[in-house]
């Protein structure tokens, strides 16, 4: 009993027992981190080290967190299925998340809307499970990375995907888009994406 009591006191003093991150508390944890990183570190640890492997939903996680730009490159997002609006209006965020395993994600809609600083290489993402890319890069004004190798064969909605993405002009002509017969509404309206770089709709 004395050993257990000592261990609990030791953990309390030195901060080694941190609150696990779950679906139930991850939004609170992010909010706490943004408002007071020092206090959040005491509770959850540094955000770069969070174990998010049990989280399945990151929708709206950094939405409107306009000053957030911390390293989350090592997050294990392999269990995530929903990244809806994850970085919506996170206008300062521009960290390397290219090594994320997003193979379980089905919803990337609005993920980078108004994420005006983001321009990282995410070309190796496995998006083969994704069915929704609606407005994914809408007004992501800096983004211009090669995503031409993405497997988008499961996607059924690409409407407004690159609307006013004023820097984007990468080759998407090899995308497998058999689920989308014709160019979606406002797919790349007011962006520099050339006709030759667009997917060949209805083909694979």
List each language-model region with its residue ranges:
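Sec-dependent signal peptide recognition
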Residues: 2-9
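Negatively charged
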Residues: 4, 15-204
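Regulatory input/activation interfaces that engage signals or partners
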Residues: 12
């Amino acid at each position: 009993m004395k050993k257990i009591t000592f261990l609990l006191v030791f953990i309390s003093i030195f901060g080694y027992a941190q609150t696990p991150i779950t679906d139930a508390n991850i939004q609170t944890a992010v909010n706490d981190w943004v408002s007071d990183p020092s206090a959040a570190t005491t509770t959850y640890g540094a955000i770069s080290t969070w174990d998010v492997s049990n989280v399945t939903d990151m929708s709206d996680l950094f939405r409107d967190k306009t000053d957030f730009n911390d390293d989350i490159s090592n997050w294990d997002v392999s269990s995530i299925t929903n990244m809806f609006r994850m970085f919506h209006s996170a206008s300062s965020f521009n960290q390397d998340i290219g090594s994320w395993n997003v193979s379980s994600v089905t919803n990337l809609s609005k993920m980078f809307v108004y994420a005006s600083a983001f321009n990282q290489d995410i070309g190796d993402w496995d998006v083969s499970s994704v069915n929704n890319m609606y407005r994914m890069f809408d007004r992501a004004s800096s983004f211009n990375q090669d995503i031409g190798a993405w497997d988008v064969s499961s996607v059924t909605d690409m409407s407004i995907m690159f609307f006013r993405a004023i820097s984007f002009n990468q080759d998407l002509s090899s995308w497998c888009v058999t689920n989308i017969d014709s160019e979606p509404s406002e797919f790349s309206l007011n962006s520099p994406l050339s006709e030759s770089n667009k997917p060949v709709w209805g083909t694979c």
